[in-house]
Amino acid sequence: MESYSQNSNKLDFQHEARILNGIWLITALGLVATAGLAWGAKYIEITATKYDSPPMYVAIGLLLLCMYGLSKDINKINAAIAGVIYLFLLSLVAIVVASLVPVYAIIIVFSTAGAMFLISMLAGLLFNVDPGSHRFIIMMTLTGLALVIIVNAALMSERPIWIISCLMIVLWSGIISHGRNKLLELAGKCHSEELWSPVRCAFTGALTLYYYFIGFFGILAAIAITLVWQRHTRFFH
């Protein structure tokens, strides 16, 4: 009986680890896709080089509506809808950031963050690190910072890109730490509730992380805009 219980716990742990790795993979692909969509938006001229481009305001409005809808109950969404909403959010974020920041900077920052998730996931599988542990989060943060140094040094990036890249890694590490219990809860639903398939758990987890990212990113953007506005008004006074 004890052996059966141990085997059952081991299987549960393996299922949860597989789902968490799925979340890291989808998040990695989402960040790289955001960079690609930003490039595409710029290429087909959906965005503009000035801050008051209409598409940016439309995208921000749609983002706010999506965030409000997801805040009601993100767990009621099935796998297919979660995937569609995830792609929609990626596209909206891509339009907003491409309207504010040079595309090459977006590609560097978002792709580096995506590589952090992918490499950390593979390293966790290789060295048998629990993907839901604090140790894994620390490993991911260090991996991300190492990638920032390697990529930006190789490309001889300007100082603002170095700073934004580092902040992006720290931001995602904070998001994962903040949402860790939520992700573990989602991973546990797979073997405790019939309606929760591994695919649904993984997509809902990735959508939850991106939801947190947009929220934190929006707060930081609001702070930055406030500081710029204060400096602007001081200049004219």
UniProtKB/Swiss-Prot annotation:
Keywords: Cell membrane, Membrane, Transmembrane, Transmembrane helix. InterPro entries: Bax_inhibitor_1-related. GO terms for cellular component: plasma membrane. Its main location: membrane. This is Uncharacterized protein YbhM. It is a multi-pass membrane protein. CDD domains: BI-1-like_bacterial (cd10432). It is found in: Cell membrane. The chain crosses the membrane at residues 19-39, 51-71, 81-101, 106-126, 136-156, 159-179, 209-229. It holds the Pfam family Bax1-I.
